[in-house]
């Protein structure tokens, strides 16, 4: 049973409800969940907030393509990709990637693949607030390097 939930939203997400949905089918043997949060320190500065913007049509298409690629590589059952936008504060959850499969290896690898591609290919723009003011966050070379293992 291949199903996916892809959401971009301002509201917080319910990890427990998502886990329940991911692991519901009796054929599921493994469920992985990654949750990314707003950290208090970035690039050597204290961060008090993060504002995320996106272009809805582009974002949904990019996320769907990432999920499709994961499904082509591994035998997966359910996938959840939920990304928040708008104003977030230190400690807030930004993103959840959840994958269920019959086997743990597929679930682990697909989750990492989706997150690596989401970080570099999904059109989200981040603006951090620090004591020195606001700044736009550019993609990191280390994030791009993570993609090499999937090529």
UniProtKB/Swiss-Prot annotation:
Residues reported in the UniProt entry to bind substrate: 37-39, 103-104, 119, 126-128
Alphabetized UniProt keyword annotations: Molybdenum cofactor biosynthesis, Transferase
Pathway listed: Cofactor biosynthesis; molybdopterin biosynthesis
CDD domains: MoaE
EC number: 2.8.1.12
UniProt-listed Pfam families: MoaE
Molecular function terms from GO: molybdopterin synthase activity
Any one GO BP annotation for this protein: Mo-molybdopterin cofactor biosynthetic process
Catalytic reactions on record: 2 [molybdopterin-synthase sulfur-carrier protein]-C-terminal-Gly-aminoethanethioate + cyclic pyranopterin phosphate + H2O = molybdopterin + 2 [molybdopterin-synthase sulfur-carrier protein]-C-terminal Gly-Gly + 2 H(+)
Cited NCBIfam families: PRK10678.1
Role noted for this protein: Converts molybdopterin precursor Z into molybdopterin. This requires the incorporation of two sulfur atoms into precursor Z to generate a dithiolene group. The sulfur is provided by MoaD.
Similarity section: Belongs to the MoaE family.
Subunit and interaction comment: Heterotetramer of 2 MoaD subunits and 2 MoaE subunits. Also stable as homodimer. The enzyme changes between these two forms during catalysis.
Name of the protein this chain belongs to: Molybdopterin synthase catalytic subunit
Organism whose genome encodes this protein: Haemophilus ducreyi (strain 35000HP / ATCC 700724)
């Amino acid at each position: 049973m291949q199903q996916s939930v892809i959401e971009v939203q301002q509201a917080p997400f319910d990890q427990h409800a998502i886990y329940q949905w991911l692991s519901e089918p009796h054929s599921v043997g493994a469920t992985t969940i990654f949750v990314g949060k707003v950290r208090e320190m970035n690039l050597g500065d204290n961060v008090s907030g993060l504002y995320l913007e996106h272009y809805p049509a582009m974002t949904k298409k990019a996320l769907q393509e990432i999920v499709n690629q994961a499904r082509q590589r591994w035998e997966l059952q359910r996938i959840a990709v939920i990304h928040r936008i708008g104003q977030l504060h230190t400690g807030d959850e930004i993103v959840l990637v959840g994958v269920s499969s019959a086997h743990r290896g597929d679930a682990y690898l697909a989750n990492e693949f989706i997150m690596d591609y989401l970080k570099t290919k999904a059109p989200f723009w981040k603006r951090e607030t620090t004591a020195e003011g606001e700044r736009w966050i550019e993609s990191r070379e280390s994030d791009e390097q993570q993609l090499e293992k999937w090529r």
